[in-house]
Swiss-Prot record:
Superkingdom assignment: Bacteria
Keyword DNA-binding: yes
GO molecular function: DNA binding
Biological role: May control expression of its associated restriction-modification system HgiCI.
Organism (species): Herpetosiphon aurantiacus
UniProt keyword terms in alphabetical order: Activator, DNA-binding, Transcription, Transcription regulation
The protein, known as: Control protein C.HgiCIP
Amino acid sequence: MTFGTFKLKPKPEHLEGVLNVLAQKIFASPHIIAKESGLSLTAVKCALAQLEQEDQLIIKHQLTSPKLQVALKDKSSDVNISATSDPE
């Protein structure tokens, strides 16, 4: 599990906040999701852990910052995840 395990499930409003941000972006880091949703980083990671457990996330690990980005599976299914080159 990328985001760890939490004893409690995330609050519905936390899940909704995370899903709203991910619906607007192809990939976003947990810090960006927290900033744009107004949630704490812990609340975001708890919601992401739940979504990861439900197999709803695509998780992209990178060597540069941000090291971790996530996207919803159904939204980014047509996106080439391995493409990292800048547009010319």
